[in-house]
């Protein structure tokens, strides 16, 4: 069974890698980041991650050759960059090439002060990618089916509502550190149903049972506060969204 699973994942990896290289425009998706600047986005310093600047700045964010680059602007000071537009039901996809160390996150239906359903981008020891977390929502849910070890090539599967679909030994093949990998998240309804993927493979699925957050909000990316990550970067490109709201 493990051999069959490994072959399936390897095939999925090779197919998805070829697709990413060509970067075709998926039906129904529209880009929400241009190649030059943050038009359509703005930096918010209203989250708790901007306390080091007394909420005056929200980290350092620039766009260079189509890549959104973020870091702490002073030691310990992060924040979010959030879309001007608000979204309800949608699927968002992007490519990531972050340094291993800074804590980030993909915020779904985010408020200006960073309350959101988060698809985690905790790209550091003991962190995970694409688990689901209630940012500013009492820390619930907090579900992940694996965590990183001390090295980016090491992962440990954990018990979760959705089993970890990748063999631990195959992780270095499935996830290509310091290359572009695709992350994807879908959120529909309220209470929301959230699904996440890495490189085309479903990682987590979560059904919330209560209405605890507005049905619309921004799409945001985070640089976490704390520590000193002024010389470590998060990088995102090819950010695109597919609207899934039911037509009236």
Model regions: which residues?
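Positively charged n-region of N-terminal signal peptides that target proteins for export
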Residues: 1-8
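Carbohydrate-interacting regions of secretory-pathway proteins
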Residues: 21-248
